[in-house]
Amino acid sequence: MKVIHLLNWKLETIEKELENIKKQGFDAIQINPMQPFKEEKEFKWWSSYQPLGFRIGNMFGDKEALKRLCSKAHEHGLDVIVDVVLNHTANNGADDPFRPHESVDKELRNEKSFWKAQRGVKNWDDRFEVTAFGIGLPGLDLNNKDLQEIIFSYLKELKECGVNGLRFDAAKHIGLPSDGVDFFKKVRKFMFLNNMYGYGEVLGGDKQWREFRDEMAKFLMVLSPHGTTLEHINKLMTFYESHDTYLNIGDSNPNHTRDLTDHDLIYIYSKLRNMYKNTILYTRPLDENNPYCRNKDGLTCDEVYKLDENEYFNRVYLDSPDVKEINKPKKLIYPGWH
């Protein structure tokens, strides 16, 4: 499965580009979390990962727009994958990171049993801390049965809109059955009964994290960077660049990919595409000076796809044995490949 990650694209924009995306050889589109989030007026790239609850509708589109997108995508032979943020909610800012924001839905905010301990992770190599404590945000206890009902009601609503798959944000921070948490067992059953699939990001390379990754693979595909090994390669979803590696630059992320050129990305992705069954290509923002969104007017991608670029793309990704022998096109294929 070849997935294109359309971070911060409005649903109506995606709908207009479906035919071109299909021509590029993709099987599925991954879109933003559809949950409401704080700070829409002062949008940052991470804003949609601080949700206010489990319902559909935000600046990228409402429930009806999601239904239309799914219907149109299916007409073009494309699956729709929605990013879901279940591990945490929006907080009260840096000075009060572990308490939910006042705009978080009352059914969550007012129920004390829904929340993890109000403390942060100190040892990121300690699996218990990473799954039981907060990650700079108010953590939700996904082992709570009442909370699970709310979450699965939301996932069912996504399915009813036509969604095919789910990308579980912060999956490595959600406990597994070996931790005494049954959430992903229920997720597996839900997806089986609803003919859906899902994947969750699991990072870390030591023995403890490899064990966590291998257990996760019993329930979801494992989303992990190039170089990760897994016994069942069909359970691996591989990427080289993600929104985190491109947008989250600074001392906390020395391995960012901002310096990669368009040629680097074309070459790397063409290789991954031939090496792995399941791959994701992240589309960078259109304006490198405004990396938080595609433009001021609504995250559009005007005139990105042109016929000669589509032909170039297909030749590079599908046919060329050596991408380095092909000259860089005058007009780049995807926004941000500067």
Per-segment meaning from a language model:
Residues K2-K16, Q24-F26, Q30-C161, S178-V202, ...:
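Substrate-binding/active-site clefts of carbohydrate-active enzymes
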